[in-house]
A protein has these predicted regions:
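Adenosine-nucleotide cofactor-binding segment
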Residues: 24-86, 137
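C-terminal hydrophobic helical "lid"/dimerization subdomain
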Residues: 138-190
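Short helix-loop-beta connector
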Residues: 1-5, 72-73
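N-terminal Rossmann-like NAD(P) cofactor-binding module of classical short-chain dehydrogenase/reductase
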Residues: 7, 76-79, 101
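Hydrophobic/small residue at the entry helix of a nucleotide-binding pocket
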Residues: 14-15, 85
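NAD(P)H cofactor-binding loop motif with strongest signal on the N-terminal glycine-rich segment
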Residues: 10-11, 82
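Rossmann-fold NAD(P)-dependent oxidoreductase module
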Residues: 18-22
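Glycine-rich phosphate-binding loop and adjacent beta-alpha segment
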Residues: 34, 85-156, 190
Length: 190
């Protein structure tokens, strides 16, 4: 909702940069995390109002930094594509009745969750969406892609392709992704 705050991990990556743009277009204050100082400007250019460099495993420090941006109140929603390394920080930075959208495993799968802990942390919600639960039919797929391409056509979303590799260099592309050296989308060319 307009006026709310959201946390987006990997805000300079392919999915993160699109998500930041979409949220900002809807009037959401977007707090992004990136893996290095070199990625801060990329995240800002895609709609983040504040960018935090998260280069270590300090979950408590990251959660405190996110809460400080929101004057101590946390965020209403956290989008976590990283997984194991950021999952606890994502939960800890949510305000009461906040939502964690866990959709990636870049650092490994998220740890098991004690459901009872959600009540002690403020009646939190956690979801693990998969694409085909949202576009289960051809009609749903066409409707979703129509909205997506309209947003690109209308300039709401810019698709940043910052890396291109020949298909024969796929191993190098994977190495760069795993080393957190990329921004925006990465494309393999046959």
């Amino acid at each position: 909702d307009a006026g709310s705050r959201a946390l987006v991990h990997a805000a300079a990556g392919g999915t993160g940069s699109l998500l930041c743009q979409w949220l900002a277009w809807h009037g959401v204050e977007v707090i992004g995390t990136v893996g290095s100082e070199a990625k801060v400007d990329v995240a800002l250019a895609h709609g983040c109002t504040k960018v935090l460099v998260d280069a270590d495993d300090d979950a408590a420090g990251l959660a405190a930094a996110v809460r400080a941006v929101g004057s101590g109140g946390g965020v209403q929603v956290a989008y976590d594509s990283i997984g194991r390394r950021t999952f606890s920080a994502s939960l800890a930075c949510l305000e009461r009745r906040g939502l964690l959208v866990s959709f990636g495993n870049a650092s490994g799968p998220p740890p098991p969750l004690d459901v009872l802990s959600l009540s002690t942390q403020g009646s939190l919600f956690v979801t693990r969406p998969t694409l085909f639960d949202y576009v289960a039919t051809r009609a749903e797929l066409l409707a979703a892609t129509t909205r997506l391409f309209a947003a690109i056509r209308d300039g709401i979303l810019r698709v940043p392709v910052h890396q291109r590799w020949p298909l024969r260099d796929a191993a190098e592309a994977h190495r760069a992704l795993e080393a957190r050296e990329t921004t925006g989308a990465s494309v393999l060319i046959p």
